[in-house]
């Protein structure tokens, strides 16, 4: 069995956020292939099916981003799987929009969802990073990742997600180079770009920045942001 874990924040108000591209990727795979309807288990939305002759579990943690590992780790333990059977799909600030990279293991790059997966699942899993671009100024990072994709983003976002879904069997078989070439052709990016420089964590990048407009003041998301960024200074 292979577990494909898309990372994001739950709730319709966050569905279009750049931070939720992992959820979007799993939704595209779910639409394209014959998976079961979404159901709730492991503090997540899950669906099961078969790709490339392999049983596949799609999982979208509903714990909010920085607790994603609790959900995914529970699923791995239930099915007696190791990190080698896990593929995480998530947003990457330090890749150009539409650019994709995949690797086995590595650091979290400041991504809070990946920090949580590392803590609960181990390090030796495959990581598919989907570029959302950097806003260019650390003070705008929080607003960028928690902001919605714009209409112009559809020019690369739709081909990226549809091509990933169409070739999800390559992801399951571990044909990573072939998949990266497919995605690069679909989005007009290069499959052999230089590796991005290590990024500071989202927390450090955004702590001294301007808070984005219309952030929730109550509820689970508000509590998560308070823990991440602390009280606003005068």
UniProtKB/Swiss-Prot annotation:
Region (Disordered), start-end ranges: 187-234
Active-site residues, Swiss-Prot/TrEMBL: 19 (proton acceptor)
GO terms, biological process: protein quality control for misfolded or incompletely synthesized proteins; rescue of stalled ribosome
Matches recorded under Pfam families: Pept_tRNA_hydro
Domain of life: Bacteria
Enzyme class per UniProt: hydrolase
Binding site for tRNA: 14, 64, 66, 112
Swiss-Prot/TrEMBL keywords: Cytoplasm, Hydrolase, RNA-binding, tRNA-binding
Site feature: Discriminates between blocked and unblocked aminoacyl-tRNA: 9
A cellular component annotation (GO) from this entry: cytoplasm
Localization terms from the record: Cytoplasm
Known role: Hydrolyzes ribosome-free peptidyl-tRNAs (with 1 or more amino acids incorporated), which drop off the ribosome during protein synthesis, or as a result of ribosome stalling.
Subunit-structure text: Monomer.
Protein name: Peptidyl-tRNA hydrolase
Organism: Allorhizobium ampelinum (strain ATCC BAA-846 / DSM 112012 / S4) (Agrobacterium vitis (strain S4))
């Amino acid at each position: 069995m292979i577990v494909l874990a898309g990372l994001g924040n739950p709730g319709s108000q966050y569905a279009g956020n750049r931070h939720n591209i992992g959820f979007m990727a799993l939704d595209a795979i779910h639409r394209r292939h014959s998976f079961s309807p979404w159901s709730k288990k492991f503090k997540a939305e899950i669906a099961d099916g078969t790709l490339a002759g392999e049983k596949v579990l799609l999982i979208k943690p509903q714990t909010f981003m920085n607790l994603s590992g609790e959900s995914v780790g529970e699923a791995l333990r239930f099915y007696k799987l190791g990190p080698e059977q896990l593929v995480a799909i998530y947003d990457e600030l330090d890749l150009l929009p539409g650019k994709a990279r995949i690797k086995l293991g590595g650091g979290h790059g400041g991504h809070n969802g990946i920090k949580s997966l590392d803590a609960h699942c181990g390090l030796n899993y495959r990581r598919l990073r989907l570029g959302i671009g950097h806003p260019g100024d650390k003070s705008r990072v929080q607003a960028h990742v928690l902001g919605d994709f714009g209409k112009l983003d559809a020019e690369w976002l739709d081909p990226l997600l549809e091509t990933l879904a169409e070739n999800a069997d390559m992801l399951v078989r571990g044909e990573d180079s072939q998949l990266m070439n497919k995605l690069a052709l679909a989005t007009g990016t290069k499959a052999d770009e230089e590796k991005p420089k290590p990024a500071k964590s989202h927390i450090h990048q955004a702590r001294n920045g301007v808070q984005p407009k219309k952030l929730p003041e109550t509820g689970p998301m508000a509590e998560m942001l308070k823990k991440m960024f602390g009280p606003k200074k005068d």
